[in-house]
From Swiss-Prot:
The gene is RDR5. It is an enzyme of class 2 (transferase). Keywords: Nucleotidyltransferase, RNA-binding, RNA-directed RNA polymerase, RNA-mediated gene silencing, Transferase. Belongs to the RdRP family. GO terms for molecular function: RNA binding; RNA-directed RNA polymerase activity. Its EC number is 2.7.7.48. Pfam families: RdRP. This is Probable RNA-dependent RNA polymerase 5. Probably involved in the RNA silencing pathway and required for the generation of small interfering RNAs (siRNAs). It comes from Arabidopsis thaliana (Mouse-ear cress). GO terms for biological process: regulatory ncRNA-mediated gene silencing. The lineage of its organism: Eukaryota, Viridiplantae, Streptophyta, Embryophyta, Tracheophyta. PANTHER family: RNA-DEPENDENT RNA POLYMERASE (PTHR23079), RNA-DIRECTED RNA POLYMERASE (PTHR23079:SF55). Residues 103-122 are annotated as: Disordered. It catalyses: RNA(n) + a ribonucleoside 5'-triphosphate = RNA(n+1) + diphosphate.
Amino acid sequence: MNQASSRIRIALSGRIETALENIYRKHNLTPINDETRQRLSSIPENLGFELVRKVFSLQAGLIYNLDSFIVSKVNQAVSFTGYPQPANSLSPSGRHVSRVLQEEMSVDSDAPSPKSLKSEDKGGSLHIPQLVALGELEFKKVFLLLSYIPGQHVGQVITADEIRLWKDLPMVEYEAAVWDRLGRHYCPQKDRRMLQWDSGKTHYYQCNVAPNGSYTFKVLSALQGPLLEHTGTHLHKVLGDDNVLTVKFADVQKSSSTYSIDHYFTYKGIAKNGIMIGLRRYQFFVFKDGGKEEKKKDLSTKKVKCYFIRTDSTAFYDMQNPYILTGKSIYEARMHFMHVHRAPTLANYMARFSLILSKTKTLEVDMTGITFDQIDDIHCHDQDGKDVLDKNKKPCIHSDGTGYISEDLARMCPLNIFKGKCLRSESIQEACYQDPPLLIQFRMFYDGYAVKGTFLLNKKLCPRTVQVRPSMIKVSKDPSLSNFSTFNALEVVTTSNPPKRTKLSKNLVALLSYGGIPNEFFLDILLNTLEESKSIFYNKRAALNAALNYGEMDDQNAAQMILVGIPLDEPHLKNYLSILLKTEKNDLKAGKLPVTESYYLMGTVDPTGALKEDEVCVILESGQISGEVLVYRNPGLHFGDIHILKATYVKALEEYVGNSKFAVFFPQKGPRSLGDEIAGGDFDGDMYFISRNPELLENFKPSEPWVSLTPPSKSNSGRAPSQLSPEELEEELFEMFLTAGFHASNVIGIAADSWLTIMDRFLILGDDRAEEKAEMKKKMLELIDIYYDALDAPKKGDKVYLPNKLKPDIFPHYMERDKKFQSTSILGLIFDFVKSQTTEEPSPSSEISKLPCFEDEPVSEFHMQKCRLWYDNYRTEMTQAMKTDKDESANEVIQRYKQEFYGAAGFEDSKKSLEELYPQALALYKIVYDYAIHAGVSKCRFVWKVAGPVLCRFYLNKKMQEKCLVCAPSVLKELWG
């Protein structure tokens, strides 16, 4: 009888078998009998797994007879779900949404909900002792171990008992043990990851997929700057770092062994079945290309980021810890972020859903108490007061992308946020005593809505209120899902910040030249900038100016050194200044000329309605300005993308924004939005170039603004996402990812290069070549339309083509292509002039000496030995880091050593006293400089990157013996600008 029963033993899926083993162990119960196994196998696998998962989660000691308990639950489940279900008349997506709503409302029911995890386990491959043992560890330990055995199967390199021995080790000791036992045998040294796992940083878990479907793993730590802000994407913040997997698919070359008619058959299988990491499954969720800036680059550098998320897990550790998406399908999971199934097209679906991938800082506010007020857009009207329609017969609007936020909410937003990071340290309490940001670029996820744009401070609004317009709502709420929970958040991307040093661009130089700005204007700027650059090695004012202008390169380290009186010929400082000089020259060659009395400001619409059609209101540090200003927006190519407008004082604006600063307001009058006239701009965060430079205003002659000449957009004939079944939707979305990642055309970049090439030749032709110039202008206008259409094509699902007749065969020499001609346009002259300058840069010093102030200070042998070992470890790690990912890995190593040195992310956050830090900094200085004497001056960089603020304070107190004055870098820039 026993032999017969063994032969007909019912096989269950791998994840159910694993869950049952976890139940036996947790509840101290004997395995279920064959009859119970038969009952479990009679219901859908996903329902069976959900049932045993809930059994596992019960408190130990509550179950006395596992067989009868499971059978009763199976009977309840069958009764509740009514399997088998008859087909109904609803569409697949309609049934799905209806089921989701039903399940949300019955979440407290004792009967299990019929959630679908969409992917089946293959046989019992998961049911191996080593994977079960891994499942008892927290995930970061699992991932680290698997990343140290690339190409190996865990069951073949280690036993389950060995894994369990490491279970309770602290992460540092665990990493060392795993590396010693496994990593050094199977993993390159450069891939060793000794991260600050408990530092609070965002960690990015990465999976690299080869064409044959094999995986390797890697974990990266987000570099969040000196303040260690918790910055990340909405996706990572909601689910947690370890539940989001960045997946990089290698391109499949035709010559590879995996090449077939369907080149990406293997990848599609992975998208369908998911990626197993231990006993966790991750499935395709969202992708995002590099945005407009990325599209302008060469296609070989194009990056499309693909993210999988954790769906289910049979790991013992995971089953003991609640997960917000347990039992949810991918379709359902997306709806918890936004009701994206309402998107009209597939292209729009993913373009809007990828808003959850913006790098943001969360506004810490109770979203349940916010008043979410929808207001109308401001329409453009003709002389008769009628709505003006665009080429697609939609109303033109003045308020595209901008709404309002109440003062109390705005005050909760820190000042100086840029791309989700705080540029300076300040608490919310400190911010309450300052003027709030005037404009806030944001992403808002609220009750199924996804909103994108800017909030203008409105002191007139009731507290805890935001007002959004239809142009800001990218995904609207599904009324049928009123009881469906969503991950609500107000995420800040950028605030209206003080302008940085403003530079021109190649496009802007070309357009200004076309508009009548003489070559002498640009060449004078060039000459003056180069002259000042030459003096940075002996003129402290020039050196400080350069250090401040490029302060983001070294966290203002060089500026600190200069300000405390360290000589300019100090080896590291002298070497760094030469790097700045090279950087400045490269910028100048690319047309990035610094221009005075010019600013980049975030734009919005005038809330008062006071501005006339040709007026703007500009608010700078000193308040509103008056007079003519030149206005432009990158990446404008059209001759009319540069406007001359009148900056006007608007008293009534103060009632809205008070004393908040740094923005440009456009009028809400006229038949067309001024923002749209300037390179198709809007007000969802676009930055506008504003200049009151007298030479530009005196000489520039504006042209008629751009008007699109391309035909209306074709209506999308494909099925809407809501008409697809969840399975069909996933297939279509992953196909879109493959196209974007491996087959996207680079129309934007090629069109921009083609335009610049034709524009370059156009600028040097005389009036006697009128016919030829007219033909060239016609081509440029075609390219401009193609370029602007291509910028918006992804979210519309349009395909934009660039005719070969518009592509040049030869390019200006300053573009540094293989096929080139010698350009004599202003851009060619700038390039040649910079290249011809043989600036007398000091050669690297063959004799590196220490500053007496540091060398003569006694340091204990204890600190010297400690720092010597520390520096040896650093050099080993940095050598390995430079073999891969160079800048990224090198910065990560530096940041890790700063963390260790200060016990915090940087000097500003350290709780260590200067008396504690001084001996360590001095010891490190002596050791590093002794090494640099033989290895080269570039090796001095490490001690200044890590301990620079401490050394500067020691020098100031010991050498200068002067009182320290506190000064903000922005004030110094203003004084030296």
